[in-house]
Amino acid sequence: MKKYCVFLFAAMCSFMGLFAQSSIDLSGTWQFQIDRNDVGESEKWFDRTLDDTMPLPGSMPEMLKGDDVTARTEWTGSLYDSTYYYSPAMEKYRVEGNIKFPFFLTPDKHYVGPAWYRREVTLPKDWTGQRIVLFLERPHWESTVWVNGKKVGMQNSLCVAHEFDVTKYVKKGKNTIAIRIDNRVKDINPGPDSHSITDQTQGNWNGIVGKLELRKTQHVYIDDLQVYPHLADFTAVVKTVVVNNSGKAVKGAIDYVAKCQSVARGTHSVNETKYHTFATGTHTVIDTLLISERAILWDEFHPDVYRLQTQVCETYMGSLVKMDKNITSFGMREFTIDGKYFCINGRRTLLRGTVENCDFPLTGYAPMDEASWERVFRICKSYGLNHMRFHSYCPPEAAFAAADKVGFYLQPEGPSWPNHGSSLGNGEPIDDYLWAEAERMAKAYGNHPSFCMMAIGNEPRGHWVEWVSKFVDYWKATDTRRVYTGASVGGGWQWQPNSQYHVKAGARGLDWDKRQPNSMDDFRGNSFMAQAGPNEPYVSHETGQWCVFPDFNEIRKYTGVNKAKNFEIFRDILAENDMAELGHDFMMASGKLQALCYKNEIEKTLRTPDYAGFELLALNDYSGQGSALVGVTDVFFNEKEYINPDEWHHFCCETVPLARLPRFVYTTGDTLNAKIEIAHFGEAPIERANIIVYLCTEYDEKMMVGYFIKDIPVGSCFEVGEVSVPIEEVNRPEKGHLEVLISGTNFVNEWPLWFYPQVDDKELALTPAQSEGKAAKGSKATNTETPAFPYITNTLDEKALDILDKGGDVLITAAGKVTYGKEVQQQFLPVFWNTSWFKMRPPHTTGIFVNDAHPLFKEFPTDYSSNVQWWELLNHAQVMQFTDFPKGFQPLVQSIDTWFISRKIGMLFEARVGNGRLMMTTMDIDSDLSHRIVARQMRKAILDYMMSPYFRPQFEVPASTVQDLFTKVAPSMNMFTKGSPDELKPKIN
């Protein structure tokens, strides 16, 4: 009996020892050497000491390894603007020691090719005879491994960890591991602009990040475990792949412990043991766990996750002895489709998403820790978002875990934008590679409840529709835990008939370049949306892309791998054009317009029936493709000054009050009519909601104009009612707003309004007699009927020169007349994406910066930025270029040029010319003033100011310089390349 007890104790200690140390951390200093000539394998570098060292985890750029960046550096990514390489103005940035690129962030070091990493590791004695795996969480991107001089194999996933079974290669005691990482694009070409590899965002780096470990298991182990929740019967089907390489059948069991700890809903746990016999080889074991009706469900409002511990056990002398353990997370949730909408646990939801582009300048790669991703998702949630699409890449495990915790619906993608030199469906190696990557993604991340949607990549070319159709069909039949689309595409791409849902452009944007702003229209009747079947949700692809001027204060934040030397160039250009001090003002003014556009595009989507959601491009800035500053946060997800999350939340959250207004400008005798709606996608209907409508003015007057009590269902376009407000006597120009709120909640929204008085034609100097000009001192002018008005003309004619010479006042209304500035095409809407990537496609401006403290604007209420009342004056209006004006000169209404050129341009200025005073504008303040309320008021404001004692222009400008505005022509912009992005090509895939 004593011998038996000793034997049993020894056996149990042996089993316990298997779990004492199950992994060895390989982080630390590794030997390192660049293999520039690709000779390392033939020269057996895996078997010798390397000549440098580098810490892992880490990347070569992060550790300042590689080549200095020069003008000859070959980047991974498309360029459609070659001015940097040919323009004399860019020559100083091509000089070694001062290398700066305008197209994307600039790393200190760059290297593409193989590099070697080597180290020794000592195995514990109790690892002898066990299965041992080398785990590399995120190499970039092809890894080849040697152990003790013997080649183990190669892996090249861009999405999941590389795991090498090194059992046959290790020995007792010291072992040598050599890893060759190669980041070249070879036979497998994801596309140079794929965010998995491109220098446009993260950079095509060489290295290994995340966890680096040797992991030990027994020879009976869990190779895969997938959990499939079913809400109909509150069960979870667990598919466990058990591998038995022990050489004999093993009788035992699988022990399951699932536990959810919810702060709001308590704790729920399930413990079940299922008995099995594990024959030699690989087997899939399917067990069903009864979670019960006490199951705690997961969604964006209650992101409660179950932690499942699964242990494979062997029956030993009547007891279960643990052999291998797997810990995973899953959510009791179902993400499905109901008609045109997505459903979470049977309740409709609307995706309010952003596109994440692997843009992390400090490291140059996606964060590998959960805390960093949790910060990103919580910031996005503070802006009312609930969804993220990962553009042509798949994030690491930490991102899914953080999204599970925060409650975010994710669409990771295969690591490919198979275009611009690559293709899909043409029989190239990328076809099989992406198919395998999807399998790997589902295996690695499939249990995460946040993994709700999947696509293979972005905007392919080739015979891709047939390929993605097979892809979607396969996954629909294979794994119903999420929904599938083939690829996320622009409006010009072919339709994907087999996709369960569609991420496609076409039904997006604002048409304010063609008609005046309103909040009436929506995307009903859109031809793109009409293509989708009755059970196929439609999500807008890359919504927004409205630009904002760079924030040069941001430059100091780039303390890591990638530096904002593009911003330094843009700052220099602004300074060279005599506007160094205006950078922050331009950022703020253009940002206000950007936020206005995002608000109205999002609301337009919310006003559209059967619209499943939108994906912004993006909440944060995009640092590449010419520097696409499209975010209301910087690239680091820090808020910009012109709008904060609370303000954004008014028009972008689960419950948004909406008002359909045909216009935003009113005058005496008009009637303000508004249809009130609610888009509500909260966790439950709102019963007996008190909905209040206020009309507010800038003078703190607040009048209730509507009150409704309604039960608000979950869904879009819920009609609340209408309000109608007669606009009585308007005595002065005034700004106001319409406010709609749901009492007792934080759901409130507002729309800007402008009220202008009726203006008598006599005050506008519309007749020839009135516009002849007042008598200047010493002149022979005798017109005494209208002595107050300046001389009004549309050019600097001889009479204007004579009046100015004699000390008189002149107003030039030069709409459509100037040539110097004609090269700049202005619209009310700002630059889309950026002018470099789209080869100077108009518009070229990002709004206006107004000297709103100037006395002229006493009669024309305005902020320092453009708002919807400016549309009538600004849209398609010519600008004047002030390059030749005196240093320090600034117009009263300054158009904000594309930051690649930053010409000093504008639409309204004053100056002393000769002995007189000149006011000149290219805004149309002449035509159809009986219908153009804003233009009429602007004309009156200008005239009133010119006739006031405050008309004292600061700068003196030669008459010849003013005359040049009508004769001089600026040189055309040469991009020095014939290539163009897909959207500018006549035929799109």
Region spans (language model):
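Substrate-binding/catalytic cleft of secreted carbohydrate-active enzymes
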Residues: 377-378, 387-633
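Short alpha-beta junction capping motif
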Residues: 787-834, 915, 921, 942, ...
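Accessory beta-strand-rich segments of carbohydrate-active enzymes
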Residues: 33-37, 66-67, 77, 83-97, ...
